[in-house]
UniProtKB/Swiss-Prot annotation:
The Tat system comprises two distinct complexes: a TatABC complex, containing multiple copies of TatA, TatB and TatC subunits, and a separate TatA complex, containing only TatA subunits. Substrates initially bind to the TatABC complex, which probably triggers association of the separate TatA complex to form the active translocon. It is found in: Cell inner membrane. InterPro entries: TatA/B/E, TatB. GO terms for molecular function: protein transmembrane transporter activity. Gene3D superfamilies: 1.20.5.3310. GO terms for cellular component: TAT protein transport complex. Keywords: Cell inner membrane, Cell membrane, Membrane, Protein transport, Translocation, Transmembrane, Transmembrane helix, Transport. It comes from Acinetobacter baumannii (strain ATCC 17978 / DSM 105126 / CIP 53.77 / LMG 1025 / NCDC KC755 / 5377). Its main location: membrane. Part of the twin-arginine translocation (Tat) system that transports large folded proteins containing a characteristic twin-arginine motif in their signal peptide across membranes. Together with TatC, TatB is part of a receptor directly interacting with Tat signal peptides. TatB may form an oligomeric binding site that transiently accommodates folded Tat precursor proteins before their translocation. GO terms for biological process: protein transport by the Tat complex. This is Sec-independent protein translocase protein TatB.
Length: 145
């Protein structure tokens, strides 16, 4: 941490003995030890906080990447849904257009003149004279077995 070797410590000890003397040296050593422990604890806490912030930063980055992936997937699904809806609308328009453009067959009927016999009618009439169907009697359907 401080890169202090054994020779440097020995030099500090000799200088401390010369400056402080043998009576005040133990008290100064305790004072220096307390400050050393406080400094070491502070540095350790600072390192832990930095590591925690880095982990949180990495976690936030991973969360943002996942959110970006989810948003991209959501956009893709929305595009597919829009395409399907457009396709359904175009198909329904095609169906209505083909229904409008498809011509119904024209039934051309020409009256037949003369007398004819229609089965299940009670009287003989001419087609040109027959305009109302209410003149016919009810028809019974018989199935041959």
């Amino acid at each position: 941490m401080l890169d202090v070797g054994m020779t440097e410590l020995l030099c500090f000890a000799i200088i401390a003995i010369l400056v402080l003397g043998p009576e005040k040296l133990p008290e100064a050593a305790r004072f220096a030890g307390r400050w050393y422990v406080r400094l070491k604890r502070y540095i350790t806490n600072l390192q832990n906080e930095i590591d925690q912030e880095l982990r949180l930063s990495e976690f936030r980055k991973e969360m943002q990447e996942e959110l970006n992936r989810i948003e991209a997937l959501e956009r893709k699904v929305q595009q597919q849904l829009d395409e399907i809806q457009k396709q359904q609308v175009s198909e329904s328009l095609e169906v209505t257009e083909t229904a409008k453009t498809t011509q119904k067959p024209i039934w051309k009927c020409t009256p037949i003149s003369g007398h004819y016999k229609v089965p299940y009618l009670t009287k003989v009439t001419s087609l040109a004279a027959q305009t109302d169907i209410s003149e016919t009697s009810p028809v019974e359907l018989k199935i041959a077995v």
